[in-house]
């Protein structure tokens, strides 16, 4: 008896998120393989970017499924809701990751800046 992955994952929000992560991760990996071949990024950079994109795509997909289900409506309303929620979730994820990376690169302890100072600088 064959196992049907997509219908199995579509039964729950976490499953939908996993499916989104698989698709988003595959797209990120394809992009990073090309960049690796062109020697524009290192293996470490490719792995980190692929991981970030995989998680972000999974979260965005899961949130878009929740939003579309909560709003209901017809096909157009559901698709529009899913699109807006997915874009918003991915944007928030990317922005959060950028803030964390900047803080790590800056070396918060080395410059003695408080969390409030760092946040104020990033939001300015």
From Swiss-Prot:
Effect of disrupting the coding gene: No growth phenotype, magnetite crystals are slightly smaller with a wild-type surface. Deletion of the probable mamGFDC operon leads to a slight reduction in magnetic response and slightly narrower magnetite crystals.
Biotechnology: Foreign proteins fused to the N-terminal membrane-targeted domain of this protein are expressed on the magnetosome membrane, subsequent purification of the fusion protein occurs by extracting the organelles from the lysed bacteria using magnets. In this study human thyroid-stimulating hormone receptor (TSHR) and class II major histocompatibility complex (MHC II) were expressed and purified; expression is better when the endogenous gene is deleted.
Parts of the chain that traverse the membrane: 9-29, 65-85
Any one Gene Ontology molecular-function term assigned to this protein's record: metal ion binding
GO CC field: magnetosome membrane
Chief localisation class: membrane
UniProt entry keywords in alphabetical sequence: Biomineralization, Iron, Magnetosome, Membrane, Metal-binding, Transmembrane, Transmembrane helix
Lumenal side: 30-64
The keyword Ribosomal protein appears for this protein: no
Highest taxon of source: Bacteria
Protein's job: Probably involved in magnetite crystal growth. The lumenal domain may bind the magnetite crystals, affecting crystal size and shape.
Further facts: This bacteria makes up to 20 cubo-octahedral magnetosomes of about 45 nm in diameter which contain membrane-bound crystals of magnetite (Fe(3)O(4)).
Record text on subunit structure and interactions: Probably interacts with MamA.
Domain remark from Swiss-Prot or TrEMBL: The lumenal magnetite interacting component (MIC, residues 36-56) binds magnetite in vitro when fused C-terminally to maltose-binding protein. Isolated MIC binds poorly to Fe(2+), Fe(3+), or Ni(2+), but improves quality of iron particles during iron co-precipitation experiments. The lumenal loop (MIC) probably has to form a helix to interact with magnetite.
Protein name: Magnetosome protein MamC
Organism: Paramagnetospirillum magneticum (strain ATCC 700264 / AMB-1) (Magnetospirillum magneticum)
Organism lineage string: Bacteria, Pseudomonadati, Pseudomonadota, Alphaproteobacteria, Rhodospirillales
Gene name of the encoded protein: mamC
